[in-house]
């Protein structure tokens, strides 16, 4: 079987997110898994890390690639990354869901197409 190298990669910076949401590893883990499911991705594994005194990283390993969040609660900031290979998964659905639960005051986003030669910025 031949596989396509085509992929969609979305990177997002969120500012003005509630401290308590960004410092709750279990809340974020639950919602990232749900976001992956909504996008049509298949979750293989989840890795989490709480930092001292604050901050969380959640990495959701997908059959199609990955979904991750790194938080800096003291700055009310989160960095989200979602990369999916192929055409059967829509990473924007995962991103939209996460943004809807974190409710940032400000968002910066880049959408890239990868695996077709040159990386294409679709913004």
Curated annotation (Swiss-Prot):
InterPro entries associated with the record: AdoMetDC_C (IPR042286), AdoMetDC_fam_prok (IPR003826), AdoMetDC_N (IPR042284), S-AdoMet_deCO2ase_core (IPR016067), S-AdoMet_deCOase_pro-enz (IPR017716)
Cofactors: pyruvate
MF terms (GO), sorted A to Z: adenosylmethionine decarboxylase activity
Cofactor note: Binds 1 pyruvoyl group covalently per subunit.
UniProt organism field: Bacillus anthracis
EC number assigned by the record: 4.1.1.50
Active site: 65 (schiff-base intermediate with substrate), 70 (proton acceptor), 85 (proton donor)
Name this polypeptide is given: S-adenosylmethionine decarboxylase proenzyme 2
Subunit structure comment from the entry: Heterotetramer of two alpha and two beta chains arranged as a dimer of alpha/beta heterodimers.
Endpoints of the signal sequence: none
Mod. after translation: Is synthesized initially as an inactive proenzyme. Formation of the active enzyme involves a self-maturation process in which the active site pyruvoyl group is generated from an internal serine residue via an autocatalytic post-translational modification. Two non-identical subunits are generated from the proenzyme in this reaction, and the pyruvate is formed at the N-terminus of the alpha chain, which is derived from the carboxyl end of the proenzyme.
GO biological process: spermidine biosynthetic process
Family: Belongs to the prokaryotic AdoMetDC family. Type 1 subfamily.
Gene Ontology CC terms, in alphabetical order: cytosol
Pathway(s) this gene product operates in, as recorded in its UniProt entry: Amine and polyamine biosynthesis; S-adenosylmethioninamine biosynthesis; S-adenosylmethioninamine from S-adenosyl-L-methionine: step 1/1
Catalytic activity of the protein: S-adenosyl-L-methionine + H(+) = S-adenosyl 3-(methylsulfanyl)propylamine + CO2
Site location (Cleavage (non-hydrolytic)): 64-65
């Amino acid at each position: 079987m031949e596989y396509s190298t085509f992929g969609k990669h979305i990177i997002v910076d969120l500012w003005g997110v509630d401290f308590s949401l960004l410092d709750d590893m279990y809340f974020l883990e639950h919602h990232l898994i749900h976001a992956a499911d909504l996008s049509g991705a298949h979750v293989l594994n989840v890795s989490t890390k709480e930092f001292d005194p604050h901050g969380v990283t959640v990495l959701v390993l997908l059959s199609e690639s990955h979904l991750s969040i790194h938080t800096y609660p003291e700055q009310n900031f989160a960095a989200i990354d979602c990369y999916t290979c192929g055409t059967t998964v829509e990473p924007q659905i995962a991103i939209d869901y996460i943004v809807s639960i974190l409710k940032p005051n400000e968002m910066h986003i880049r959408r890239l197409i990868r695996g077709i030669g040159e990386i294409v910025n679709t913004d």
